[in-house]
Regions:
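A contiguous strand-loop segment
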Residues: 23-121, 141-201
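Positively charged n-region of N-terminal signal peptides that target proteins for export
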Residues: 1-4, 18
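Second-shell loop/turn segments in exported
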Residues: 113-115, 123-132
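Sec-dependent N-terminal signal peptides
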Residues: 4-13
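Single-residue recognition of alpha-helix boundary sites
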Residues: 13-14, 109
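Sec/Tat signal peptide C-region and signal peptidase I cleavage site
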Residues: 16-22
Length: 201
């Protein structure tokens, strides 16, 4: 009887389980790595992303050029924003300046989304990689894009690194709240699929 009860409890537990869809990043600062490198790993828990390696070549644009924004997850056209005069070469999640941006999604309440926003988390990553040289510049670029054009995704934690520094930046809901924290020199950090920053300034 005890075995049967245990089996029934286990079956109930398993029947309520959801499959995991959890991106995970590991961030290692130059002071914590053996050779002084910044390292960011990115495990996107999605069967459709295995082997993806996106390429955006460096380019020059005339004054007044516009960039089309397409929602990263759905492929839906969202709108246009002004393009900058020069963009950097991007392969995967790293640009020619060794700036890396990865993400983990922790979601949020459905009513916190901004249907008027033009920038989703994927567009934010790749536009920023094309426009920024350093982690600090990336944080500034991301904040400006969200402030100017609105943020349409849920809660996201971005792992941002250049050869000298490692940062975690988080955006929540409508893009009204955002925060960034510098990872100290000799640290290894796991950035799971959850909000890590608790106080936003």
């Amino acid at each position: 009887m005890k075995k049967l009860l245990t089996l029934l409890v286990m079956m109930c537990v398993v029947s309520f389980m959801k499959p995991a869809q959890a991106c995970t990043n590991f961030l290692i600062t130059p002071g914590a790595s053996a050779d002084g490198s910044s390292i960011v790993s990115y495990a996107a828990d999605s069967h459709v992303l295995y082997g993806e390696l996106y390429h955006y070549p460096a380019a020059d644009y005339p004054e007044g050029a516009m960039r089309e924004i397409v929602d990263w997850d759905s492929g839906r056209y969202v709108g246009r924003i002004p393009e900058v005069a020069h963009t950097y070469n991007v392969v995967g999640n790293m640009n020619e300046w060794q700036l890396v941006i990865a993400e983990t999604t922790y979601g949020g309440l459905p009513n916190m989304g901004n249907p008027e926003g033009l920038i989703d988390y994927g567009s934010l990553i790749y536009i920023t990689l094309q426009r920024s040289k350093t982690a600090r510049e990336a944080i500034k670029t991301m904040a400006e894009l969200v402030a100017n054009y609105g943020y349409m995704s849920d809660g996201e934690s971005f792992s941002i690194a250049d050869p000298n520094e490692v940062w975690i930046m988080e955006l929540i809901g409508k893009g009204q709240e955002k925060g960034a924290v510098w990872v100290p020199v000799c640290y290894l950090v796991e950035n799971p699929e959850c909000c890590c920053l608790r106080i936003f300034h």
